[in-house]
Amino acid sequence: MKSKNRSISKPVAPPKVVTNDAENLSARNISFVVQGQIQPETYTFLQALRRNFPEAELVLSTWRGKYDPCFRRITDKMIYCKDPGAVVCSYYREVVQWNNLNRQLVTTMAGLNAASRPFVAKVRTDFTLENSTLLSFWNRYPKRQSDALLFRHRIIVPSLYSRVYSDQPTALPIPFHPSDMFAFGRKDDMRRFFGSCPLLTEKELGNWPPRYPNRVPYPSCRWRWAPEQAIFYYAAKSKFPGLRFDDWTSFNKEILTVSKKLLMNNFIFVNPCQIGLFSYKHRDALRGANLHGDWPGLITNSYFEDWYKASLDSDLVVHSKNKGTAAERYELHKERMLYPLKKMLRSLGWFAEPFACLWYGAKNIYKR
């Protein structure tokens, strides 16, 4: 007997609301999979994870030829992967941008396969957690719609680069786009999330002709899907095989409806400061993502909670609208205060050039 394709786009009746049972979490049940190329700050970031989650398992999944004995002392397991390489996907302001999707898939799955605990946090080597507040969000949003269950439990992801539409002036939709910078969930759910997407071809990664050229959300990018989209689209397709999303320009009303329903029922979206997510490289972006609704297109915690309260639980005490923690409010108002200044200074980038000319001219004369 042939199995019927599962679909969530045309329900025959209003979806049933189901509730996940509360689970007691502790660090001893968690494996941290720290994946990617070793960065100068990686050792310090591993120390922070060890300090904040002392009983957790630390798995470092990186490339062959990157051996350093100091990492052996702080991690429980080290995995050395063969590098599948990256592909040039765009030229932004004449700077080459690389698509590292295949690299992320290889190191993440190698780390997940080595992890021995029932819960896994996937962290990039240029990120860390500065506290353990992550665990407090696990049981906070238990209700879900029964016809949109992709994972056994929601996966926690940050608002940074979790999108519903682009932040470009066109504000084009970007379906199936949860963040891939950090994720925490049950190990079996994490395997479905990151393990369903195959390694993509060079054409898909960086030389794809868009089906609808006038719908490209970010014109400099030449991939078939954004990495985040490819990961989640294939995960969704593993459960709902009738789903079809040919490339990131192939969206319509039905796709957008399905995407939002799957995102809102399978993830917990938190602002970076709510879980202590930190990165030197992405520090400004992380601060911007803490703004409650001020970064166009991002799925912030307030956006997620508004949907959850309206769709699943009218009794939800909305965390992000209830001022949040003092630290969150400090970051929020500081960023709102500085954002106009930063925007103005970026527009005056030329102003620094005369000083740079004087500085390097003087150095050149001095050397002579």
Model regions and ranges:
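Short aromatic/hydrophobic "clamp" motif used to bind/position activated sugar donors
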Residues: 120
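Active-site-proximal specificity loops/subdomain of glycosyltransferases
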Residues: 61-114
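Membrane-proximal basic amphipathic "stem/tether" segments
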Residues: 1-16, 292-368
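Short acidic donor-binding/metal-coordinating loop in glycosyltransferase active sites
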Residues: 123-127
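Short, well-formed alpha-helical segments that are part of the catalytic scaffolds
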Residues: 14-18, 38-52
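Catalytic core and acceptor-binding pocket of nucleotide-sugar-dependent glycosyltransferases
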Residues: 129-303
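A conserved hydrophobic helix/loop-capping motif in glycosyltransferases and polysaccharide synthases
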Residues: 30-39
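Short loop->beta transition adjacent to catalytic acidic/histidine clusters or analogous donor-positioning motifs
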Residues: 28-30, 51-60, 76
